[in-house]
């Protein structure tokens, strides 16, 4: 998951001293815990979609709304909540967010019908949004620059572990006790992680409240939306996530069906591959230095395309290798695109990053639901065609950006040609 930089001059203690070691350790562990809770809850129904579809007698695309509604809620709430964090405090907003989201998680197993489940998931997504809207800004304010880098890395690691463990846990619990029990297990995990976060996190020392200025926020957002290069990066983030979300939303349906016929637990276990994203994100820096931004995007797209083509075979081994390539390519491309947003934005970087997150999670919603609809009507080959269309479009946008960079003077957009 991308993290959101919401630092603002009015609230950052530029000369803030670093914490002593015990406090820094507590902060690191607290942010790891809340990062794990965030992604465990966010995608808790993804591995359960075949069971949910069967339980409510609905199509895959209808069941997929239990994932898409959550990411839509997050996308719509992240920008307003990042603004509220400037006024009311990062730690306070994260506490309210994780408490509310965990409380809603406890209600999910009790949902009497699909509409109720989708509504609860949308509310949960909006609650979760306060965490990525505040986490990096909190770390930037409370720790010195050197310690912040490691702390952000642990927060992202928590995201990866939570995203993987939530999916794998639900798959195995559902196989033995049903999908409602699986959601209850994730809720317990989220509550425990929320308690760990709350007990460990020290009181913020360097936060200074800023006044809410909606006009300034709107002006900053409008300015970013008028920049073609930022719009291209937002489109790339949306399309990459649409392809990735489509694959992982539907893969469970394919693996439990013939010719594979895996159990729910085994099908859910493929989400361990999600951890490949941690490695590819970590390698993005050195590869970016060698390939340049656009070269890195081409490499990411080609890797994901190769993975998609491998999944067309009837060999389980080839499908798993394909998923590894898709996952690695997606996370690499996402790391490049999201990192470029902060580099390109000359002002209001918090809002520029927030807009990227909006596009990213809208892509998750679009890809999950549209991909499931395509799969329902055209089987896996149709899903692959859908994801390929998204990736090819991403490549064309990157190609257009390359042509623009070569055609225009470097003085007009300094430092952006890769």
Q: Could you say what each language-model-derived stretch is?
A:
Residues 116, 145-147, 153-201:
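Helix-loop-helix hairpin linking two adjacent transmembrane segments in secondary transporters
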Residues 76-114:
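Conserved MFS/SLC helix-loop-helix module at the cytosolic interface between two early adjacent transmembrane helices
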Residues 13-22, 202-234:
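Juxtamembrane intracellular "pre-TM" segments in multi-pass secondary transporters
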């Amino acid at each position: 998951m991308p993290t959101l930089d919401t630092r603002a001059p009015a609230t950052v203690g530029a000369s803030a001293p670093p914490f002593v070691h015990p406090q820094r350790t507590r902060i690191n562990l607290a942010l790891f815990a809340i990062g794990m809770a965030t992604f465990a809850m966010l995608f808790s129904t993804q591995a359960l979609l075949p069971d949910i579809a069967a339980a409510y007698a609905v199509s895959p695309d209808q069941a997929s709304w239990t994932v898409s509604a959550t990411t839509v809620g997050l996308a719509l709430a992240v920008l307003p909540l990042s603004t509220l964090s400037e006024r009311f405090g990062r730690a306070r907003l994260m506490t309210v967010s994780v408490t509310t989201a965990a409380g809603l998680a406890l209600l999910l197993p009790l949902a009497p019908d699909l509409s109720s489940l989708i509504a609860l998931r949308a509310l949960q997504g909006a609650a979760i949004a306060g965490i990525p809207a505040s986490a990096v800004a909190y770390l930037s304010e409370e720790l010195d620059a050197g310690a912040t880098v490691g702390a952000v890395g642990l927060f992202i690691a928590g995201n990866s572990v939570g995203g993987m463990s939530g999916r794998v846990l639900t798959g195995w619990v559902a196989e033995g006790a049903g999908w409602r029990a699986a959601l209850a297990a994730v809720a317990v995990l989220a509550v425990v992680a929320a308690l760990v976060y709350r007990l460990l996190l020290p009181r913020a020392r360097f936060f200074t409240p800023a006044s809410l200025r909606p006009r300034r926020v709107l002006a900053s957002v409008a300015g970013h939306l008028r920049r073609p290069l930022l719009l291209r990066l937002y489109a790339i983030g949306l399309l990459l996530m649409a392809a990735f979300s489509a694959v992982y939303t539907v893969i469970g349906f394919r693996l439990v069906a013939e010719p594979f016929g895996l159990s729910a637990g085994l099908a859910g276990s493929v989400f361990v591959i999600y951890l490949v994203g941690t490695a590819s994100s970590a390698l993005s820096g050195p590869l970016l230095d060698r390939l340049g931004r656009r070269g890195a995007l081409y490499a990411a797209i080609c890797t994901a395309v190769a993975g998609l083509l491998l999944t067309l075979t009837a060999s389980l081994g080839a499908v798993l290798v394909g998923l590894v390539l898709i996952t690695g390519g997606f996370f690499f491309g996402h790391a490049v695109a999201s990192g470029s947003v902060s580099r390109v934005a000359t002002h209001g970087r918090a809002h520029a990053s927030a807009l990227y997150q909006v596009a990213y999670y809208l892509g998750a919603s679009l890809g999950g639901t549209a991909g499931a609809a395509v799969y329902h009507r055209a089987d896996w080959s149709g899903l692959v065609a859908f994801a390929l269309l998204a990736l090819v479009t991403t490549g064309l946008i990157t190609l257009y950006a390359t042509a623009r960079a070569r055609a225009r003077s470097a003085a007009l957009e300094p430092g952006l040609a890769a």
